[in-house]
């Protein structure tokens, strides 16, 4: 008796994947992997950019704090240079490399050492950087070197000007038209000092410090 042929079931016909299905699955997986990698790369890039922006903000804030502390504690104490010559308490002409040089108070002394609370500082604009200088003592001995600290980089320009007792802004101090040259007892300290920083990324930062 002939054996009847049973039709194959749909289950038997669908065991496994065709080559086309495998190719499509691989393509979808590759696209998803690329999208996932791109998303991760964007996250990492954004995180790095955010950290750089935060570091820059902290640098600017710390620098402004130091500048403000220096100028707000300016004192009328003239000094002697390494040659014994008297220099003004505040001057823009002591050194061609310095924007300004002055005496300030408030030097910390947590160990109660036998030293003055006054210190001599200066600011330089060098290679797109604002550099702060501080000398170990007020009256410099021959060969005395200042400690240099870079405060801000990526600077386009720095300008400092001084408000005299006639309410006129001066680019130099002591003002050249007063004839004063050696001490702030002859040329009184300015009424105010303006500092303008032009940053390549943040633009202009302007600070005005009133002198007591």
Regions found by a protein language model. Name each.
Residues 194-200:
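Short, exposed beta-strand-loop hairpins at the edges of beta-sheets
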Residues 35-141:
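Extracytoplasmic beta-strand-rich oligomerization domains located immediately C-terminal to a leader/signal peptide
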Residues 2, 11-40:
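N-terminal single-pass transmembrane signal-anchor helix
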Residues 202-204:
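Short acidic/polar inter-strand loop motif in beta-rich domains
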Residues 103-188:
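Intrinsically disordered, low-complexity regions enriched in Pro/Ser/Thr/Gly and acidic residues
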Residues 190-192:
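Extracellular Ig-like/FN3 beta-sandwich strand-entry sites
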Residues 206-210:
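Edge beta-strands of extracellular beta-sandwich domains
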Residues 1-14, 53, 212:
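Short, Lys/Arg-enriched, disordered terminal segments
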């Amino acid at each position: 008796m002939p054996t009847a042929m049973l039709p194959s079931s749909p289950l038997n016909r669908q065991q496994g994947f065709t080559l086309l299905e495998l190719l499509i699955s691989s393509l979808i997986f590759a696209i998803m992997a690329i999208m996932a990698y791109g998303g991760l790369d964007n996250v990492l890039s954004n995180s790095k950019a955010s950290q750089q922006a935060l570091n820059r903000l902290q640098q600017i804030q710390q620098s402004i704090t130091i500048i403000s502390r220096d100028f707000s504690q300016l004192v009328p104490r003239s000094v002697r240079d390494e040659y014994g010559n008297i220099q003004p308490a505040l001057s823009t002409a002591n050194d061609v490399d310095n924007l300004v040089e002055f005496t300030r108070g408030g030097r910390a002394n947590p160990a109660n050492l036998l030293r003055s609370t006054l210190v001599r500082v200066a600011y330089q604009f060098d290679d797109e950087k604002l550099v702060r200088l501080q000398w170990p003592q007020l009256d410099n001995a021959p060969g005395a070197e200042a400690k240099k600290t870079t405060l801000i980089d990526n600077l386009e320009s720095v300008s400092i000007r001084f408000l005299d007792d006639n309410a006129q802004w001066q680019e130099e101090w002591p003002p050249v038209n007063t004839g004063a040259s050696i001490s702030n007892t002859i040329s009184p300290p300015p009424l105010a000092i303006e500092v303008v920083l032009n940053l390549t990324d943040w633009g202009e930062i302007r600070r005005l410090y009133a002198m007591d």
